[in-house]
């Protein structure tokens, strides 16, 4: 099958959706499908076309990035020029999916849309802009989907956007061949000056407001015997460094910056506890928590829809009130204090990912959605 994945950002841009699309595309290629990723050319130094891990990548001309959204109407022309059996768009940001919906509608190409989270219109734009978006662009995109997918049932039940479209729940997935308990984390500890005998708390994600890193930095005050390893870059990086200095914890927090996907498994292997402190519905799944679980690490995750559905509180990890740094610290301390509990939770996490979130199992379900979409379009 000729499959086109359409997403706002892709390699070398780092993020949860980018990671999911890459894993999905690799597995589809492994199964013999022809996969093209259409994405934005947000950086003009990137090639318009390239082959990456067996995937064709085409980058559409991008005029600007506005409110973290690539403005690339050329996506429509790129899609119009590709031979394809089905397209699969990933949202948000919303414009890319809208471009895909318009292009697929014109050429009667079946379209699957995965809504990874709700679109949050910045309050600074005012309620009229949000109302206009909810009444125009959002339904104009979603109603053109042949099939609609969301990543958790909790998100489907609480989303303002998708519930009326009867979406299918298919979670994000992890490549269990890359994320394994036997990955060696010692080189990462050595690289960042972390002793073998000191507890390490890891968080991975873009440094943007909805990730809740401010609360994690504040929580570090209440776990004075641990080191915190923060992986990722973004507009909040400088303010997080300043906050760490102001709170007197800068010497215990390592800002590792952006890390390439090829070495990311070793970062998970280097930690004792993984924390996902997100505070907003923009984090509707949290694939990094699955990656930590696949590596055999216990996790502390936020008590928000979607994210908390990935674990059973007390089994693979603990659920915390992420807007309360003291509660976050309490859950971190509880895990660091009990080696046996961490080991049991780590094994349980690996088993959960193997059972419900393997890339092979998820792609089995996605292939059925593609086949159904193609069948509906030709009926």
Task: Place the predicted regions along the sequence by residue.
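Carbohydrate-associated surface elements
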Residues: 41, 154, 173
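Conserved acidic donor-binding segment of nucleotide-sugar-dependent glycosyltransferases
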Residues: 312-314, 318-325, 334-340
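A conserved mid-protein helix/loop that constitutes part of the nucleotide-sugar donor-binding site
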Residues: 19, 199-222, 235-241, 326-327, ...
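A short, well-ordered alpha-helix in the C-terminal region of glycosyltransferases
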Residues: 327, 334, 341-355, 362-368
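Nucleotide-sugar donor phosphate/pyrophosphate-binding loop at the beta->alpha transition
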Residues: 110-112, 120-140, 157
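Short hydrophobic beta-strand element within catalytic cores of glycosyltransferases
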Residues: 294, 298-301, 311
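Short alpha-helical donor nucleotide-sugar binding micro-motif in glycosyltransferases
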Residues: 142, 258-259, 266-271
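Nucleotide-activated donor-binding/catalytic signature segment of Leloir-type glycosyltransferases, i.e.
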Residues: 241-259
